[in-house]
Amino acid sequence: MILLDTDVLLDVALDRAPHAEASAALLELLERRPRMAFVSWHTVANFFYLARPSRGAQQSREFLTDLTGFVSVAPTDTEDLRYAASLALPDLEDAMQVAAARACGAQYIATRNVKDFRKSPVPARTPEELLEELG
C-alpha cells in the first residue's frame, strides 16, 4: 500500500517538469494494481485548491474523479488526528499524511519531499524510488 502525497498528484495534473514523468509513471503502475494506493482526505482539498487556478475547477474535479477509479481515500478519524499531533514532525500537514498512511496500512508515502518525512514511522520514497522497487 502507498499513500500519495499532494505533490505527486500536482506533478501529473499540472505537467510539472521534470517531475511529471516519474509521477505519471507511478500513477500508471498503480492504476494497473487497483486499491494499492491511497490519498488522505486533506490531499484532495489541497490538490483542488492548488490545481484549480491552472486547470480550472471542472478539469481539477475530473482529475480527482479519474483518480478514484484506482485510488481510495484513507479512512481517518479523531484518533488519527491525535496520533498526528503526537508525532515529532515540524509540519502538522506532514504528520497528518503519516497518520493517514498508518490508517490505511501504507508501507510508503510517495512524495518528492522525502526530507520532510525523515522522522516518519512510515518511510517516504520518491516516485522514482517506488518505480524501481515496484517495477
Feature-to-residue mapping (PLM):
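Short, conserved active-site loops that position catalytic residues or coordinate cofactors/metal ions
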Residues: 40-45
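A general alpha-helix detector
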Residues: 8-9, 46-47, 83
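Short beta-strand scaffold positions
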Residues: 4, 38-39, 75, 111
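Short, well-structured alpha-helical segments
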Residues: 61-65, 81-82
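Short, well-structured N-terminal submotif of metal-dependent ribonuclease cores
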Residues: 1-38, 52-62, 119, 133-135
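Active-site neighborhoods of divalent-metal-dependent phosphate/nucleic-acid chemistry enzymes
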Residues: 71-114
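Acidic, PIN/NYN-like endoribonuclease modules and their adjacent C-terminal/linker elements
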Residues: 1, 70, 102-135
